Amino acid sequence: MATTPLAERLRPQHLDDYIGQEHLVGNKGVFRKFFETGNVPSFILWGPPGVGKTTLAKIVASQLDRPFFTLSAVTSGVKDVRDVIESAKRQRFFDQRPPFLFIDEIHRFNKSQQDSLLGAVEQGVFTLIGATTENPSFEVISPLLSRCQVYILKALEDSDLQRLLERALTVDEELKKREIEVVETGALFRFSGGDARKLLNILDIVVGATDGKVVITDKYVTECLQQNIALYDKKAEMTS
């Protein structure tokens, strides 16, 4: 049985496998132009959870073959930012192209933490990629925001979720070992709420609920999730 979550196993490595956000990654999308020219400005990805912000950032770095540093705004401080800046400067001795610095939940950085990024962004020490679920106009300081493009990511539509479901069932080696029949997708998509990661987590739960053939119906999905919530509540009671 696989220990890596389905969402991580299915994380796309190339833009052609990326699902959703056609306004950004379609044939005329700005991210296609990035790959054609190799010129990428610092930018912030703003959108709800599970719509592909982290994945898109990783694809950009991978397809342009540039170093990729990451920080989580939840656990990192000014010292961590300075350490990355020094690492990025050393990297420039070997590669004139600036590395990428990806900061997840950049809205969690306070003013002094965001200030510590300014000089490096301005000097091109690295290309900043921020990800946020909050409006950057309110959460990112003006000097930093003025140096970044902002790209809005939208919740996935049902057609996107359908493509993701089909990809999971045809590509994932663990799921291919199981007999799975999809009869209804209404509950699966409704509970996902346009969140790709949530869809794949629910699919993981539904498939893992039985050792036999999996028949996905609205009723079965609802029952599996109710049982999962009940089990979680019971465990919480035992540990509280």
Enumerate the language-model features and the residues they cover:
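Short glycine-rich substrate-engagement loop in P-loop NTPases that contacts/grips substrate
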Residues: 24-28, 68-100, 111
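Conserved AAA+ ATPase "sensor/coupling" helix adjacent to the nucleotide-binding pocket
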Residues: 147, 160-176, 205-208
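C-terminal helical "lid" of AAA+/P-loop NTPase domains
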Residues: 186-191, 197-211, 223
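Conserved AAA+ ATPase "SRH/arginine-finger" region at the nucleotide-binding site
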Residues: 72-74, 149-162
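A short, basic N-terminal segment
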Residues: 1-37
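C-terminal engagement/docking regions of AAA+ P-loop ATPases
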Residues: 217-240
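Short regulatory helix/loop adjacent to the ATP-binding pocket of P-loop NTPases
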Residues: 118-119, 135-149, 166
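Walker A/P-loop
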Residues: 2-4, 33-72, 86-89, 118-123
